[in-house]
């Protein structure tokens, strides 16, 4: 620590506080500014684009400093939090008038990316999560806390790949890991990683603190008593939250045990490729959520995002949601509910801020309005007969006493903060009313005093006024100042005037200013009492908020089903995926022409479709729409199809698109193969797999070989697979793999221009139309002509693989050249190595039968 003896008393105070918070920027309150000093000032000046100055000296050197106005701090804090910085807020808690030496200060709150709760610093439509992990390469405990809602969950996960996929799903703003973990682990590549002391993860201490937080003897009731690694991580989260918030956390009431087995697992690549809530450019436009989310409240939008990113495998829950949506669609009942739900607002985060004791007056006004809307909403729900909706209605209370309390206590349109008062209604508290009357009557007193003094002194330019620095005063022009009566005491000299005070005015000033400060203190005390009373009702209010958010999502899905022509899917026990007239929900919305719907049929007999056809023909759209239909079914939503029948899936994999990983030192092909390896290792017979153009990132023979082998492996796994390819050789797979079938996206050429028809038809494509697509893209005509010459030569020098004709009696169109045609057949290769004199007649017959099966 710096030698403090060489520094001024104020800087000594600063260094003592800064020493306790070395990793955070310190906002040090000085009057109407937050000041930053030394390295904090340099860093903040760079990040916030504010002026770096050097004022005064301490320890014999100029002090680098930067400041931001107290009243506009929120905007600067929001920017720092988005940049991943943490800030310690150091306030003046002493009275400057009575302080000897520097005003007493202390850190009242630490704002970090994962524990921020201020409305202005949060994205209202995204969860803001704090996570912690503990474990080794084989087993990890993961704890996740949303301090803005009170959701607190734990789970144990096997293996790095699964852990990283879960972290990608959650996308925590901050991630806590033990300080004794080795450097360079995969988790450290994430943003917002903070290393914490190993003892912060101690399991025994964690168990004790969690039981104390929830008021229980053990954690058995939460189903996580034996999750020792996850409990250690949860204990670290709880301690970190308390350390940063500097208050109790009454809104953290329980711990949920999440299980991966209950969900449809999507890895990071699949989540990105399907563009669930973030598009490939990092924005939110043209994502699945942008189409299916018309929720009335922000808390419902966040719930919708959680549903989309964590589809369920619990058929009972999914069918209960479907039944609820169907009920809300009857007689358009959702239309009555949605305007009332809009009045509820973001109840979830308002209640969290009340629990954290940093709720603002407008939070209480919004809570008042939400509680006032609940009785009408309850009445509207009485006609909903779906069991799940009835359960939600039972959970949603009305709280008439709290509604009345807030209606009496808070003015209609309160100010943003309690700091200057003006929040509590007249008539709520007699003592406050009396003090405010005394303060507010000052204006009339001053007018009367001014009239009397003008009459007494005969000075018509005399004025009586007030300012915050010098208090009350009588002002005379400089030329009349000499005529002031003897009882006028000089208070302030201005350029053209003199200000005075009289004993009468001084007595009034003492009384009025005392009343003003006492009124403000009383109002703040009443506000704190209100928060405490509300905290006593947090548990049922939070349960109501959760039920209201789910009701909002279900009403939204009913509205979307009506306006997007979505239909109810049917889950079945036997393995199948049948879709009639399926559509891509996002592409359909952006097309100016009608979307071409297509069917899909996978079942016990057909597990894989090899999809061929031209680029831009719709292969990727067809594959993605299948995955999105399956995913929507697994959140309980209706789906964009005329009819859908499916069994539950355990995972959705996608290997679509190509991009390199420059930061990780991986080429496009390496990324492609890594994703392919993950699929081949983890796909099961209950998985849905989308494979698009596997092998295109390397040489033709290597790529074709890899694609062929991968397709064979998936066929043996019996995963539901859509395998799009330009390797026409793969269309012979059905001959050796009975569960594989061919389909193609059709197109035609007209006047040497390609026309995409987008229909999915049985059988392989007749040609790829690659040159036509190149021409459409604007490749120069001489290049296209030269390519035609090369293509003609290649087609005549390579033997095409014999394929069945397209229609009975008509020869097939010329196929793409079989690049394997020039390779020796494996049977021929084996035959060339056999010496007939070395084998018996029986061995020769066995070989003959084996070769017969393979040819």
UniProtKB/Swiss-Prot annotation:
Check the record and name the InterPro entries matching this protein: DNA_mismatch_repair_MutS, DNA_mismatch_repair_MutS-lik_N, DNA_mismatch_repair_MutS/MSH, DNA_mismatch_repair_MutS_C, DNA_mismatch_repair_MutS_clamp, DNA_mismatch_repair_MutS_core, DNA_mismatch_repair_MutS_N, DNA_mismatch_repair_MutS_sf
Task: Show the SMART domains listed in the entry.
Answer: MUTSac, MUTSd
Which GO molecular function annotation, any one, does this entry have? mismatched DNA binding
Region of interest (Disordered), ranges: 796-816
Please tell me whether the keyword Transferase is annotated for this protein: no
Q: Does the keyword Ribosomal protein apply?
A: no
Domain of life of the source: Bacteria
Alphabetically sorted, this entry's keywords are: ATP-binding, DNA damage, DNA repair, DNA-binding, Nucleotide-binding
Output the Gene3D superfamilies linked to this UniProt entry: 1.10.1420.10, 6.10.140.430, DNA repair protein MutS, domain I (3.40.1170.10), MutS, connector domain (3.30.420.110), P-loop containing nucleotide triphosphate hydrolases (3.40.50.300)
Residues given in the record as ATP binding sites: 613-620
One GO cellular-component annotation of the UniProt record comes to:
cytosol
Q: Where are the transmembrane segments?
A: none
Biological process, per Gene Ontology: mismatch repair
Similarity comment: family membership? Belongs to the DNA mismatch repair MutS family.
What does this chain do?
A: This protein is involved in the repair of mismatches in DNA. It is possible that it carries out the mismatch recognition step. This protein has a weak ATPase activity.
**Cross-referenced HAMAP family:** MutS
Record protein name field:
DNA mismatch repair protein MutS
